[in-house]
Design a protein with these regions (language model features):
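Bacterial N-terminal signal peptides
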Residues: 13-24
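N-terminal secretory signal peptides that target proteins for export/translocation
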Residues: 1-9
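N-terminal acidic, glycine/proline-rich low-complexity segments
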Residues: 30-342
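A general, composition-driven signal for non-globular sequence regions
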Residues: 4-5, 22, 29
Length: 342
């Protein structure tokens, strides 16, 4: 005899929750593209070109949808946006919305962005003539479904500060913090050194105060995951590129800074992009785990960071699981795929 016994409501809720998580994982594995806004400094390190190349490759595979690209910092040649547009155009995506930070700091001269601007097809204006990153952010976010957008920050947090403290405008009646709270699913940040240290993206050129303000005021409903200096610094990718990488924008960028084409380059930004799109693992291969429970404390003067165990602000940082050489091979395999033939 079969007896029907009603399950308690809390058990039903738990089972439904597990089913939804499982269905979400299956959907992501079979083509539900992650909606991404990438916020890059694109200044002196060709690794930003690597990261954008990787994101376009993941988009070609159906794993990501690039909603917009914005540049932060002040590249003195005013060619950061053009370099971004070169890569997107190379991959057949010339119409991705593109904006630039208008704040005038921190300043640096790039040895490769003007080369990309002058030698490869694109349609972007110099940074001064591009739309503001703030306008691009608000316009793109306003059009997206709630809790659907992953922001990838691989530079300074200056644009995010502008968005966070922005007022309602033509795009949305929501203030910036409320627009983020409603539309953003997750923020992935290349920044900091964990459990403590000083790192470039949080500290260079007087951005410590900005870093402090963003992380203090970010809505706790939207998780932040940090990919620290120690994560990318141990993964040297691209040692085979001198022999295997075809001529094009990425090869040119790597040739003109840090001898990166010959020796490879640390993979800070690329790994942040990889996490933003694939999460902690892919097809049964675990890349990282999360250190959770607590938050980052920032010194506003120096930009130095310390992980505190309390209060819990829905922040976490990546902890390496897959050995660096294997992560490098994951990146290289994707980068060397090149643009999908249209």
């Amino acid at each position: 005899m079969i007896m029907n016994k009603a399950l308690p409501l809390h058990r039903i809720a738990m089972i439904l929750g597990l089913l939804l998580i499982g269905l979400s994982a299956v959907a992501n594995s079979y083509g539900q593209a992650v909606k991404v806004i990438v916020d890059t400094d694109m200044l002196t390190d060709p690794e930003d070109v690597n990261a954008l190349w990787l994101l376009n490759t993941l988009a070609d595979r159906g794993e990501a949808e690039i909603l917009a690209c914005v540049v932060n910092g002040h590249e003195t040649n005013r060619a950061s946006g053009a370099a971004v547009d070169v890569v997107n155009t190379w991959f057949g995506r010339p119409n991705i919305p593109l904006g630039a930070f208008k704040g005038g700091y921190p300043k640096k001269r790039s040895p490769f962005t003007p080369l990309l601007r002058d030698r490869f097809p694109h349609s972007a204006s110099d940074d001064d003539k591009l739309p503001s990153a703030l306008d691009i952010y608000r316009g793109v976010l306003a059009k997206q479904p709630d809790k659907s957008v992953v922001i990838v920050s691989i530079g300074f947090l200056v644009n995010l500060k502008d968005v966070l403290f922005s007022a309602p405008d033509k795009h949305s009646s929501l203030a910036g913090v409320d627009l983020i709270r409603r539309k953003v699913k997750k923020l992935a940040v290349m920044g900091g050194k964990y459990p403590q240290g000083v790192e470039y993206n949080f500290s260079f050129g007087g951005v410590g105060k900005c870093t402090y303000e963003v992380l203090q005021q970010w809505p706790a409903e939207v998780p932040i995951v940090f990919s620290g200096y120690e994560i990318g610094g141990r993964v040297i990718s691209g040692k085979s590129y001198k022999q295997k990488l075809p001529q094009g924008p990425l090869r040119m960028a790597l040739e003109h800074q840090y001898n990166a084409l010959a020796r490879g380059r640390e993979s800070w930004d690329e790994l942040t992009v990889l996490y933003a799109v694939r999460g902690l693992s892919c097809q049964g291969v675990e890349y990282w785990k999360l250190h959770c429970g607590g938050c980052v404390s920032i010194d506003a003067k120096t930009g130095s960071d310390v992980w505190q165990n309390a209060p819990n602000k829905n922040q976490s940082y990546l902890v390496e699981l897959l050995p660096p050489d294997r992560l490098a091979k994951v990146l290289e395999g994707l980068i060397l795929t090149g643009p999908k033939k249209k």
